[in-house]
């Protein structure tokens, strides 16, 4: 893989900014910028920046190359699971829609052209292990998102079967809230809720088996889905990245502990040592923490997709 670029914020004159999230910038692509022969419909340019967030706060320091690594992991999984579920990618060359004067090398590995879909307003979460907010729910109620689980399970223990635990989609700066399946049905309807649940568990099981063969445990993951004008369901946004998933090295996994993960845990652990109220603005992060975090993302990309950045 070529030398990584660093991008904190993307500004693309001529492409209307639709949304700037914690990590991704999303632009509308005017019809005249699309290549000749592009099918009817609306299209977006989705850019994965190197912004770093923790505790729902965007921090001032980027992780160099993080956006490229996230984009490459997503693209790998979109291709790997295309037989299970269609996705939002179009295959349109990013360079062909960029404004004049913009360096295409800056966006080549961190941006994709996607279909514009109607998002399903629920985060679709699959859990195969009892950790994080699921572990907290279980300790308090013996359930996770209203799903009964056996007594006596321990932290990080593998569940008898993967479970689907939806959550609300929060705005930037707010926190997602776990809901049960009945609440999702009330929000989106039974038919769509069942399609999303079935797709989520099907993809999770496939990805978990693949990752396990490579010495990685996929403990849980979060998907986003959208529908087109005909009601077809697509997986969209990011897919099975270290930001949206909890990956553990299999050789360091131990029930009863919180295993190390391929994500920004170094950053969260550092922030927990500070006298900081977990509200914006966030504190600066030491260079050593930045580099250790970057290396974790790079290792995940290498082990899962066979793509090396170092």
From Swiss-Prot:
Gene Ontology MF terms: ATP binding; phosphoribosylaminoimidazolesuccinocarboxamide synthase activity
PROSITE patterns (alphabetical): SAICAR_SYNTHETASE_1 (PS01057), SAICAR_SYNTHETASE_2 (PS01058)
Keyword Ligase (UniProt): yes
InterPro entries: SAICAR_synt/ADE2_N, SAICAR_synth, SAICAR_synthetase_CS
GO CC annotations, alphabetized: cytoplasm
Pfam family, one: SAICAR_synt
GO BP terms in the entry: 'de novo' IMP biosynthetic process
Name of this chain's protein: Phosphoribosylaminoimidazole-succinocarboxamide synthase
Gene it is expressed from: purC
């Amino acid at each position: 893989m070529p030398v990584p670029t660093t991008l904190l914020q993307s500004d693309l004159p001529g492409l209307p900014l639709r949304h700037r999230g914690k990590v991704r910038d999303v632009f509308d692509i005017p019809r005249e910028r699309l290549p000749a022969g592009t099918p009817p419909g609306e299209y977006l340019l989705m850019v994965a920046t190197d912004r770093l967030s923790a505790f729902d706060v965007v921090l001032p320091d980027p992780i160099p190359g993080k956006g490229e690594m996230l984009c490459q992991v997503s693209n790998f999984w979109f291709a790997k699971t295309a037989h299970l579920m269609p996705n939002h990618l179009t295959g349109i060359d990013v360079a062909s829609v960029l404004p004049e004067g913009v360096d295409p090398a800056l966006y080549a590995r961190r941006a994709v052209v996607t279909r514009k879909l109607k998002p399903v307003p629920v985060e679709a979460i699959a859990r195969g292990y009892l950790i994080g907010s699921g572990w907290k729910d279980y300790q308090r109620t013996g359930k996770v998102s209203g799903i009964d689980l056996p007594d006596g399970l321990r932290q990080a223990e593998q569940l008898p079967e993967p479970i689907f635990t939806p959550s609300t989609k929060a705005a930037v700066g707010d926190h997602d809230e776990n809901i049960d399946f009945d609440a999702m049905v009330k929000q989106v309807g039974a038919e769509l809720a069942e399609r999303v649940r079935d797709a989520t568990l099907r993809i999770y099981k496939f990805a978990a088996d693949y990752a396990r063969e490579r010495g990685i445990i996929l403990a849980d993951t979060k998907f986003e889905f959208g529908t087109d004008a005909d009601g077809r369901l697509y997986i969209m946004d990011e897919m099975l990245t270290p930001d949206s998933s909890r990956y553990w090295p299999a050789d360091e996994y131990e029930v009863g502990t919180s295993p190390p993960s391929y994500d920004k845990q170094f950053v969260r652990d550092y922030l927990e040592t500070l006298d900081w109220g977990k509200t914006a603005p966030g504190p600066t992060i030491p260079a050593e923490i930045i580099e250790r975090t970057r290396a974790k993302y790079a290792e995940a990309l290498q082990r899962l997709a066979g793509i090396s950045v170092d």
